[in-house]
Swiss-Prot record:
Quaternary structure note: Homodimer.
Function: Catalyzes the condensation reaction of fatty acid synthesis by the addition to an acyl acceptor of two carbons from malonyl-ACP. Catalyzes the first condensation reaction which initiates fatty acid synthesis and may therefore play a role in governing the total rate of fatty acid production. Possesses both acetoacetyl-ACP synthase and acetyl transacylase activities. Its substrate specificity determines the biosynthesis of branched-chain and/or straight-chain of fatty acids.
Gene: fabH
Domain topic, free-text comment: The last Arg residue of the ACP-binding site is essential for the weak association between ACP/AcpP and FabH.
Pathway annotation from the record: Lipid metabolism; fatty acid biosynthesis
Catalyzed reactions per annotation: malonyl-[ACP] + acetyl-CoA + H(+) = 3-oxobutanoyl-[ACP] + CO2 + CoA
Protein name: Beta-ketoacyl-[acyl-carrier-protein] synthase III
């Protein structure tokens, strides 16, 4: 049997930091309130730097390729999960292909699963490798949500940061990705929006979110999907070494960890330093944990994410 196995990870975050103390000067909020409500102390932001969605994706990809120790010429597919592409078209994936000087006989495309974008992209890549359609896939999660945040809305501007994370998936005989599950429900599409499309456009596109409703649904749906993927994989909760959650809200993360019976020290947390980086949050956290020596080859990881759409998903894998 052929598995899709992670061979390298990489990430990138902008240099500029926006702290809760900085936000106290911008909106009616406090560090204590933000930490209690969501668990974020600071976030990295593009602001006026030369960074953008494409450049962050490229930098994260370079680091993943370096760790994987592969010749970039062997990459035979690029999938980018993002909700904040630099352009309507061309795709971010094609721009990454250009900047990395990758060969032209490969597919390169974006998918928009919002905060669940990386898990969606990972699932698609897994199927391609399992079915023999590719052997080395570059999967990237990247977002620049601070560019669509309303900095006068204290309920949302405190949440988000910018960044990118990437993995190299390689066809392998040793177990890698064991299972992925993806769900969506468009009936809840109005709960998180940034209306800047062709047909419905705000003069300045801003992210809008009904936080209380999203919180309740996230806790419920993520709890259900982690149970579902463990059962589907024939494993037990005790088989999970690490939970790598989407870093949206510490209370949501704690609810999922409690459902799994995992202590906090077995949960990879970067939300305090990064905030919610949308599709980038899981690969950012994975990269940080691998480079810190927390997560090691052979560990069993459970990834889960929930975002606008509403779309949510989970992946169970052996590193």
């Amino acid at each position: 049997m052929t598995y899709a196995r992670i061979q390298g990870v990489g990430s990138y975050i902008p240099q500029q930091i926006l702290s809760n103390a900085d936000l106290e000067k911008m909106v009616n909020t406090t560090d204590e309130w933000i930490m209690q409500r969501v668990g974020v102390r600071e976030r990295h932001v593009i602001a006026n730097s030369p960074d953008n969605t494409t450049t962050m994706a490229v930098d994260a990809a370079k680091r993943a390729i370096e760790m994987a120790g592969i010749d970039p010429a062997v990459i035979d597919m690029i999938i980018v999960g993002t909700a904040t592409a630099e352009y309507y078209f061309p795709s971010t994936a094609c721009l990454v292909q250009k900047h990395l000087n990758l060969r032209e006989d490969i597919p390169a495309f974006d998918i928009n699963g919002a905060c669940a974008g990386f898990v969606y992209a990972l699932s698609i890549a897994d199927q391609y490798i399992r079915n023999g359609g590719a052997k080395h896939i570059l999967v990237i999660g990247v977002d620049s949500l601070t560019k669509v945040v309303d900095w006068k809305d204290r309920s949302t501007c405190i949440l988000f940061g910018d960044g990118a994370g990437a993995v190299i998936l390689q066809a392998h005989k040793e177990p890698g990705i064991l299972n992925t599950i993806l769900h969506a429900n468009g009936d809840y599409s109005d709960l998180i929006t940034a209306k800047s499309g062709v047909w419905e456009r705000e003069s300045v596109p801003h992210l809008h979110m009904y936080g209380k409703e999203v919180f309740k649904l996230a806790v419920t749906k993520l709890g259900e999907i982690v149970d579902e993927i463990i059962e589907k994989s024939g494993l037990k909760q005790s088989d999970i070494d690490w939970l790598i959650p989407h870093q949206a809200n510490l209370r949501i993360i704690e609810a999922t960890a409690k459902r799994l019976g995992l202590p906090r020290e077995r949960v990879i947390l970067t939300i305090e330093q990064h905030g919610n980086t949308s599709a980038a949050s899981i690969p950012l956290a994975l990269d940080a944990a691998v480079r810190a020596g927390k997560i090691k080859r052979g560990d069993t990881l459970l990834l889960e994410a929930f975002g606008a759409g509403l779309a949510w998903g989970a992946a169970l894998l052996k590193l």
